[in-house]
Amino acid sequence: MSTISPDEQMQSGDFEAPQSKILCSGTNSYLITEMCGEGAFGKVVKAVNMATSQEVAIKILKREDAARREMWMLKAVSALDPTKSNVVDFIERFQDGGQTCLVFERLDMNLYQLLQQRRGHPLNLSEIRPIAHQLLTTFAALESIGVIHTDLKPDNVMLVNHEREPFRVKLIDFGVSFMRSENTRGMKTQPIGFRSPEVTLGLPVSEAIDMWGLGCILLFLYLANHPFSVDCEYQGMKGIVDMLGQPDDDFLKAGIYSHQFFMEDKHWCNPGWSIKTPSEFESGTGIQVKEWAGDIGSLNDLITLHPVLNGSIELQDRRAFVSLLKGLLQIDPRRRLTPQRGLSHPFLTMVHLMDNMESPYVMHCLDSMGVLDLDDYDDEEDFCSDVVAEEDPWVEEASVVPQSEDTGSAPPHSSVRVEELDPPCDETAAAGSSDVVAEEDPWVEEASVGAQSEDTGSAPPHSSVRVEELDPPCDDTAAESQQLPDAAQETQLCEDTRPARVSRLKRMRKFFGRIVKRVKRLFR
């Protein structure tokens, strides 16, 4: 939401001067102290409960349908503990002057304002890590109740109290959220610049769109700039293709809007898709393409983007961060990290830093994680699920020890071996992949639905794509299994040793949990 100046506050016809306006519910009276901002659905003000002196934020909605929608989602989210799940605490709803008022706890500033306060200086990894952990925890909680936020952007992630609890954050604004069970195919949700490929191209959506949005936010914090265009949908899609690669052909065939952004060549022996030029997009849609130039060409550029101040330890941490981003920014939502798998990623567990516990860099990283609520850390089992152990390629990639800057030789090996972090080795998954895809991938079922014709507006003939032709999530491991002569034996070995490796990973998580809690106590 945009900031409103004092002059605009005084001239507004909907509000009196903030110092004199009182909003009354059935049980409480709130004195408005400041106008915060205005959006499409309403205005937000800061206020004080006149009876208890509690500071609150009040969202005053213009439209009743928007109010009903947001209340419905807030009731669903109220099943969660707002502190443990890092969502804004909703207090009450009331009517005042025919307008619906929603009262929330008062928070500090949002992430966009934080970067403004830092004068455009990006966050470092020790600051990004606790934010990533908290938001992954939030989305794991939302996933458990079937809620998709859909509006993840820096403005909707707020610091609780940055002075007392640095980088403690909460997620706000459920005004355009929806339930997993709702039919949302073709809905243009998510802000441009944080919009996932499946939303842009018109495929069915899932909780995976929030994981994409999270990846964009973490990248935004590290760059101190938007990674993709925020005001041109074409440039947003082209930026994704330039940085991450083009969506697979079967993915494009399934999209309602794919023909707006891509051209399908059917005249060659090997037909395929290619992204349109700006002029082709403009002539086909009538929408003018805006200029955009990104900061990086690929995610790997992030490793050396900023000066390295802590040698190979920091480089290793950057590689882990890039690995996390690659998991969150997978174009295919079936391959994208889930919240639980994200929480088990080495960048969050910091297992790659274990051999350098006395390093000032590592101690600073541990200190920054002290903002997390780790009272039950030792008892958590979800973070090290079998799914992560069997399927997560990002764990293996982030565990590779980087080369030393000075000598080019590898630094001392970590006691955490790559094989202990469970690289993907489940060749048997490929055999049953068709069933898995058919059961779990909502957009596959509708892959035969063609895009609307640009010229006539009529639907073209159904695509010949079949479920069994689509690449399953584990197709890379399936290809490897065909090349290895002893694949069956290797699979059996992996299955025999997996429980021990999962147990070791759990012990490492508990070890780090105890360390973080000790550091947290030292700094109290």
Task: Describe the residue ranges of each PLM region.
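Conserved HxN/HPN-centered segment at the entrance to the catalytic loop
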Residues: D81-E92
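Catalytic-loop of the protein kinase fold
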Residues: E143-N161
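C-terminal lobe substrate-recognition/regulatory segment of protein kinase catalytic domains
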Residues: D248-L324
